[in-house]
Swiss-Prot record:
Substrate binds at R9, R26, K37, D46, E50, S84, Q88. It comes from the Bacteria. Residues 105-285 form the Prephenate dehydratase domain. Catalyzes the Claisen rearrangement of chorismate to prephenate and the decarboxylation/dehydration of prephenate to phenylpyruvate. Keywords: Amino-acid biosynthesis, Aromatic amino acid biosynthesis, Cytoplasm, Isomerase, Lyase, Multifunctional enzyme, Phenylalanine biosynthesis. It is found in: Cytoplasm. The gene is pheA. Its main location: cytoplasm. One of its GO terms (molecular function) is chorismate mutase activity. It comes from Haemophilus influenzae (strain ATCC 51907 / DSM 11121 / KW20 / Rd). This is Bifunctional chorismate mutase/prephenate dehydratase. One of its GO terms (cellular component) is cytoplasm. SUPFAM superfamilies: ACT-like (SSF55021), Chorismate mutase II (SSF48600), Periplasmic binding protein-like II (SSF53850). CDD domains: ACT_CM-PDT, PBP2_Ct-PDT_like.
Length: 385
């Protein structure tokens, strides 16, 4: 006799709770691992060990005839490994950089429910900190609140996998004395959010931030005669649509934010790319020390001469010192037509002797060189088998 669906679901619930208990135990062991590495001074990330672990788990499941696909096993344990790595990084960083104020003040673009707000919450949760939300009307205001000390940190979007670089943030970095102290990647899932039951054929006006509009351009072009209203943030768009309460308008934003304003989801997954991710940076008034055991990035701002090959000569310094460059972005120099400055992101800690030597050599090939920040690489690249 077949089991009742309710009985099956009860068994699943019991198994899920057992899984949660085991995951919690594994999470706690990550602290034992990092304390051991703290004594031995071993590197935090051990890619060979991670690959070996995945291979052993896949083989074990096959030997035991668990009927689980290798890809399924690796995807689950890649996430578990990522949690372990980030947990260990946070432990070391908190020991190096004591935060006197337990209630952090974090500035971000928009109101509650904006993507920047959700990213700020994610960052605070990672470091297990309570925080006071400081919503801002512009990226410039985020910088100002940190500069004046009103905020401990500012969280800003730097680039998106669909729309590319956030040029306004890059340009503000040119003129700030703030330091980059962190990064995080946040998955972006745009939705059409409305007040009440309606359908897409009724929608004639869409509200959202320009970046969101750009990231959903293909979906928007598929609609007939729709008008775009640009807002200072996606949360501001949601607030407007909620307050206007009309059946012919919609906001483009995230589902969690929509719930805060009483909006319903009309359509999901409307971004041009399915895997739509925004990389956020975290800025502070003072730099934060990064443990030598942690994978680290450094962002530089540089200008070179206008001679042929000047940029190539500068970049060869990193090749000489075997330093990997993860980002090269150019922006115009205001007041100097056709001249550009370059943002370079490298996988290196500025306190490492080899990095110090490379930066000294780089000065010989640059007219201007500024270190914008050195921070933990918190985007964990998954290993594969």
């Amino acid at each position: 006799m077949a089991l009742e669906l309710s009985d099956i679901r009860q068994q699943i619930t019991q198994i899920d709770r057992s899984l949660l208990k085991l995951l919690s135990e594994r999470h706690r062991l990550a602290f034992d691992v990092v304390r051991s590495k703290e004594i031995s001074q071993k590197s935090l990330r051990d890619v060979e060990r991670e690959q070996q672990l995945l291979q052993e788990l896949v083989q074990f499941a096959e030997n035991e005839n668990y009927q689980l696909e290798a890809q399924y096993i690796t995807s689950i344990f890649q996430k578990i490994i990522e949690d372990s790595v980030l947990t260990q990084q946070v432990y070391l960083q908190n020991k190096l950089n004591e935060q006197r104020n337990q209630n952090l003040h974090i500035a971000f673009l928009g109101k509650r429910g904006s993507y920047s707000n959700l990213a700020a919450r994610n960052y605070a949760a990672r470091y297990q900190k309570q925080f006071v939300e400081l919503g801002c009307q512009s990226f410039e205001q985020v910088f100002e609140k940190v500069q004046t000390g009103e905020a401990d940190f500012g969280v800003l979007p730097l680039e998106n996998t669909t729309s590319g670089a956030i040029n306004e943030v890059y340009d503000l970095l040119q003129h700030t004395d703030l330091s980059l102290v962190g990064e995080l990647a946040y998955p972006i899932k745009h939705c059409v959010l409305v007040n009440d039951k309606t359908d897409l054929n009724q929608i004639d006006t869409l509200y959202s931030h320009p970046q969101v509009i750009q990231q959903c351009s293909q979906f928007i072009h598929s609609l007939d005669r729709v008008h775009i209203e640009y807002c200072e943030s996606s949360s501001h768009a949601m607030q407007l649509v909620a307050s206007l309460n009309k059946p012919n308008i919609a906001a483009l934003g995230n589902e969690d934010g929509g719930k805060l304003y009483g909006l319903s989801v009309l359509k999901t997954n409307i971004a041009n790319q399915e895997n739509n991710i925004t990389r956020f940076i975290v800025v502070a008034k003072e730099p934060r020390e990064v443990s030598s055991q942690i994978p680290t990035k450094t962002l530089l701002l540089m200008t070179t001469s206008q001679q042929a090959g000047a940029l190539v000569d500068a970049l060869l310094v990193f090749k000489k010192h075997q330093i990997n460059m993860t980002k090269l972005e150019s922006r115009p120099i205001y007041g100097k037509p056709w001249e550009e400055m370059f943002y370079l992101e490298i996988e290196a800690n500025i306190h490492h002797p080899d990095t110090k030597q490379a930066l000294e050599e780089l000065k010989n090939y640059s007219n201007y060189l500024k270190i914008l920040g050195c921070y933990p690489s918190e985007i964990v690249k998954p290993v594969s088998v």
